[in-house]
């Protein structure tokens, strides 16, 4: 049986300052570094060994993966970075303070933008300082592919081709896989893996730095789910 471990990146600097982050590339906070290292220690304590690692193109997820693998003595395993595991793009909300945005638009509207499955936030302009329209890491993508705003539905549509072409084949081959990514890209994967409804997915929380372990049978059906903690 194969195992898949999902880790939301450790606390970021913008988690700490309560800003919408999305595709903006911010670093881990000091607490986030410790969360990532703790995840690695838990992985080692539970005897989890991996054949393949995946992460996004964003520093906070990449560093979380590296800290976790280093702590578990597995920094050497093959690693693939992909934009398809990036956080959900928050559109024009990127960079804004969440509390101030709620005061301006109302708590209910901001909650809908943040958690609704199919409602898009306002789109970001290309000249916005927090746009990725001219970010070099996406230069090989068709410009129309780089999002201006995403909801969870669009995020799932972005993530699924990578699941089908890379992650699922690894698991079907009996490999153990670790993914360090983001709250919403991992919520999208979790929705698919657990067949969670559009309504119920709104309430799913992904804690920073917490490893979630899935065990799959040969048909890629989940036979066990475990969250690692102290």
Curated annotation (Swiss-Prot):
Site for Transition state stabilizer, residues: 182
EC number: 5.4.2.11
Annotated keywords: Gluconeogenesis, Glycolysis, Isomerase
Catalytic activity line of the entry: (2R)-2-phosphoglycerate = (2R)-3-phosphoglycerate
Database matches in InterPro entries: His_Pase_superF_clade-1, His_PPase_superfam, PG/BPGM_mutase_AS, Phosphogly_mut1
Active site (record annotation): 9 (tele-phosphohistidine intermediate), 87 (proton donor/acceptor)
Residue positions binding substrate: 8-15, 21-22, 60, 87-90, 98, 114-115, 183-184
Pfam family, one: His_Phos_1
Keyword set includes Isomerase: yes
PROSITE patterns: PG_MUTASE (PS00175)
Top EC category: isomerase
Any one biological process term the GO annotation gives: gluconeogenesis
Metabolic or biological pathway: Carbohydrate degradation; glycolysis; pyruvate from D-glyceraldehyde 3-phosphate: step 3/5
SMART domains cross-referenced by the UniProt entry: PGAM
SUPFAM superfamilies per the UniProt record, alphabetical: Phosphoglycerate mutase-like
A GO term, aspect molecular function: phosphoglycerate mutase activity
Similarity field: Belongs to the phosphoglycerate mutase family. BPG-dependent PGAM subfamily.
Function: Catalyzes the interconversion of 2-phosphoglycerate and 3-phosphoglycerate.
Protein's UniProt name: 2,3-bisphosphoglycerate-dependent phosphoglycerate mutase
Organism of derivation: Lactobacillus acidophilus (strain ATCC 700396 / NCK56 / N2 / NCFM)
UniProt lineage: Bacteria, Bacillati, Bacillota, Bacilli, Lactobacillales
Gene: gpmA
């Amino acid at each position: 049986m194969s195992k898949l471990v999902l880790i939301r990146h450790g606390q970021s600097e913008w988690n700490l300052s309560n800003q919408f982050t999305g595709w903006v590339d911010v670093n881990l906070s000091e607490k986030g570094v410790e969360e990532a290292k703790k995840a690695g220690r838990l992985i080692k304590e539970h005897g989890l060994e991996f054949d393949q690692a995946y992460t996004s193109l964003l520093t906070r997820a990449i560093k979380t993966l590296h800290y976790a693998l280093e702590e578990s003595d597995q920094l050497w395993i093959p690693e693939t970075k992909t934009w398809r595991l990036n956080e959900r793009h928050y559109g024009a909300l990127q960079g804004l303070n969440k509390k101030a945005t709620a005061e301006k638009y109302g708590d209910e509207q901001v909650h809908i933008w943040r958690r609704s499955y199919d409602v898009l936030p306002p789109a970001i302009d290309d000249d916005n300082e927090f746009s990725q329209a001219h970010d070099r890491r996406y230069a090989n993508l068709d410009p129309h592919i780089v999002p201006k705003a995403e909801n969870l539905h669009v995020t799932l549509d972005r993530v699924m081709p990578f699941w089908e072409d890379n992650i699922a084949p690894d698991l079907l081959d009996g490999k153990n896989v670790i993914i360090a990514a983001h709250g919403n890209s991992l919520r999208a994967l979790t929705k698919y893996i657990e067949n969670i409804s559009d309504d119920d997915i709104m309430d799913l929380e992904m804690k920073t730095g917490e490893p979630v372990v899935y065990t799959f049978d040969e048909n890629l059906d989940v036979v066990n789910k475990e969250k690692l903690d102290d």
